[in-house]
Structures are given as C-alpha cells and as structure tokens.
Amino acid sequence: MDLSAFPYLQGNYAPVDEERDLAEEELRVEGEIPKNLVGAFMRDGANVAFQPNHYVYPLDGDGMVHAVYFKDGHVCYKNRWVETSHLKTERKFGRTIYGSVGKLLEVPQEVIDAGGEPNPVRNTANTNVIYHGGKLLA
C-alpha cells in the first residue's frame, strides 16, 4: 500500500498488515512478570486492510484486536482482524469498496450481485472489545 498521502496512517498509526502469534521469546519484556498475574489485555483499533480510496480520518479502518496474555509469569501476543461482513466482502474482491462515515460510497452493483455486503456504511468494529454470552465481541 502507498500510504504517503494519508498522514493518519504514518508512524505509530501505520496499519498492521498481518495477523501474528508471538511467543515470549519474540517479545521485548523489561523487568519481571508477576507469576500471579493471569489474564489478558486487549485493544481494538482502526487498521486499514486495503489501499484507501479517499481521505482517512484517524478512526477509519477495519477493526483489529491486539491482545497480550499473561499466565505463570509468562506473556504472549496475538492480533486478529475483526471479521465484519464489509471486510469479508473487500477480501473477496481484493480492494477497498466501502467509504467511511465521512464519505459514503455507492456499493457497486457487481458486489451486490455477488452476495457482498450491500450496506454502504462500513461496520468497522474498531472501538471496543466486550465478553458477552461466552463470546468476545467487537
């Protein structure tokens, strides 16, 4: 992706382009992790999956959950895309199709005919993570 025209997608805000599972040996840990610290810290945020086709606001982008897991004095990291119908449709077509709240784009008829998401308002699922009914939701 060429993101040079998008200042909100530079540096620390640049998108992560792959899902990763990192063991403790692959992470930089400073100090010691308490053995009784058990659980996970999760963060959901905007992460564009395809080359933007319009101005990008800092909160535009598909959801990606980053998680750090703690157990028995050890730590690991995982990140995963939030599998929305909009992201699945764009993956199927291999390109950006939908706009954003600030710039709605008409969904191409070919996308609708192929069973893609017809709603032009992208569900980014990039704001929060909640555990409900035995499932992790974004």
Question: Which residue ranges define each predicted feature?
Answer:
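Beta-propeller domains
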Residues: 1-138
